[in-house]
């Protein structure tokens, strides 16, 4: 098992280039199932989750060439509609293949998913929506077994669901007739999926709102143009927090600040200033790091995927911060590890109270999920001494070239074998 050794530091400086968004690339790669031509996708991050998804598509018969952050996908050779447990267990997003496979072939089997151990994350919203579109769904021996010809319908999501929205948008693309989706997720990653489908000729109205109308092609495959994945707003937010926790000036390149409005607003409340251009954000040090109150919610609210990083940052604030996690239960697993470093954090259900301004000390800590592991790295940057972060396979699922990027900012960080 590998781990990261990180030396605490008072200062970062320099530029960091932000990679393509993993959470945008995953549904975009899956959407190639809806397509008759070879698809070229640029700015695809080279992270473990992407490699898992590519191996799943290859297992279904697709031809994929992935190098230099560019993916060439040909799904004309698909000869399988069973997404096997061996691959799906590694990553929850594999469930995204359910809608497109069913829409294209009229039947499929997808193993119930694995991935981050955060809460229950049920997929029943996906299944209920597909049933409303005429699918016959059964759960057999750990697999979702789906069949039927999909027809458009009006579907209201009881809860906002990002992967659920993406799954049903893709299913509706090849369904017969109009599908109206209500309470759709508005995340930038969902918006890009809709825009790519629209560029391919699909009639889709309401992009960027919580109501979509999709006029399905009744089984006729789409033709995609070449496109690039949007920048990763969560990676960008993580590096902004790295600059903030060391109260340093750093610049993010290849970033879209409009996707980070809620994160930037909280940094400004904490006393930091930013200089923003069309594709860069420069973070300027704060005279005093102030405490903050955060409540996670769906986009355009504060993203749950940035909650752990801001908890680490709040440890440096002069006062008491409150974080209210509204989206997932069991998403405070990083707290016990931060306590090992001297953090003063109290939990009451889904609310965390963080008393800042206390010295952090280096420690051996263990990552529990993707975003929690980035919080531990941030805390290690602010701690006195050299910390070791274990189970970093979580980080490799979502952060591209993490050590190289941190080294470029002046961090002493080394990957070692246990």
From Swiss-Prot:
The active site is at residue 116. Pfam families: EPSP_synthase. It is an enzyme of class 2 (transferase). Pathway: Cell wall biogenesis; peptidoglycan biosynthesis. The keyword Cell cycle applies. This is UDP-N-acetylglucosamine 1-carboxyvinyltransferase. InterPro entries: Enolpyruvate_Tfrase_dom, Enolpyruvate_Tfrase_sf, MurA_subfamily, RNA3'P_cycl/enolpyr_Trfase_a/b, UDP_GlcNAc_COvinyl_MurA. Its main location: cytoplasm. Keywords: Cell cycle, Cell division, Cell shape, Cell wall biogenesis/degradation, Cytoplasm, Peptidoglycan synthesis, Pyruvate, Transferase. It comes from the Bacteria. UDP-N-acetyl-alpha-D-glucosamine binds at residues 92, 121-125, 305, 327. One of its GO terms (cellular component) is cytoplasm. It is found in: Cytoplasm. Phosphoenolpyruvate binds at residues 22-23. Its EC number is 2.5.1.7. GO terms for biological process: cell division; cell wall organization; peptidoglycan biosynthetic process; regulation of cell shape; UDP-N-acetylgalactosamine biosynthetic process. GO terms for molecular function: UDP-N-acetylglucosamine 1-carboxyvinyltransferase activity. It catalyses: phosphoenolpyruvate + UDP-N-acetyl-alpha-D-glucosamine = UDP-N-acetyl-3-O-(1-carboxyvinyl)-alpha-D-glucosamine + phosphate.
């Amino acid at each position: 098992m590998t781990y990261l050794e990180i030396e605490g530091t008072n200062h970062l400086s320099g530029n960091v280039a932000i990679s393509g968004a993993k959470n945008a690339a995953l549904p975009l790669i899956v959407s190639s199932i809806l397509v008759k031509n070879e698809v070229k996708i640029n700015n695809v991050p080279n992270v473990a989750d992407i490699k898992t998804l590519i191996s799943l598509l290859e297992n279904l018969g697709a031809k994929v060439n992935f190098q230099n952050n560019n993916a060439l996908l040909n799904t004309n050779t698909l000869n399988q509609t069973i997404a096997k447990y061996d691959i799906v267990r590694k990553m929850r997003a594999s469930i995204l293949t359910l809608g497109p496979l069913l829409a294209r072939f009229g039947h499929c089997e997808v193993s119930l998913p694995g991935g981050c151990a955060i809460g229950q994350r049920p997929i029943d919203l996906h299944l209920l929506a597909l049933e409303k579109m005429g699918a016959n769904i059964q759960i057999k021996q750990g697999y979702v077994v789906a069949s039927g010809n999909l027809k458009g319908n009006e579907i209201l999501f009881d809860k906002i669901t990002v992967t659920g929205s993406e799954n049903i948008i893709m299913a509706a693309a090849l369904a017969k007739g109009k599908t109206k989706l209500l309470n759709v997720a508005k995340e930038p990653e969902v918006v890009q999926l809709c825009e790519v489908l629209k560029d391919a000729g699909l009639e889709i109205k309401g992009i960027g709102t919580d109501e979509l109308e999709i006029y399905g092609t009744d089984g006729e495959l789409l033709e995609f143009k070449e496109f690039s994945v949007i920048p990763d707003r969560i990676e960008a937010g993580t590096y902004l927090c790295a600059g903030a926790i060391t109260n340093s000036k750093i610049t993010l390149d290849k970033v879209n600040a409009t996707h980070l409005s809620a994160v930037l607003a909280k940094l400004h409340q904490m006393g930091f200033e930013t200089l923003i251009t069309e594709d860069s954000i420069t973070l300027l040090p704060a005279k005093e790091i102030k405490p903050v109150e955060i409540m996670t919610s769906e986009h355009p609210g504060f993203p749950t995927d940035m909650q752990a990083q801001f908890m680490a940052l709040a440890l440096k604030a002069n006062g008491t911060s409150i974080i209210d996690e509204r989206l997932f239960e069991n998403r405070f697993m990083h707290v016990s590890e931060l306590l090992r470093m001297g953090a003063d954090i109290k939990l009451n259900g889904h609310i965390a109270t963080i008393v800042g301004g206390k010295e952090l000390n280096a420690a051996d800590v263990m990552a529990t999920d993707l975003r929690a592991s980035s919080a531990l790295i941030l805390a290690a940057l602010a701690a006195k001494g050299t910390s070791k972060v274990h189970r970093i396979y979580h980080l490799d699922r979502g952060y591209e070239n993490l050590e190289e990027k941190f080294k470029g900012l002046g961090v002493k960080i080394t990957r070692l074998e246990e």
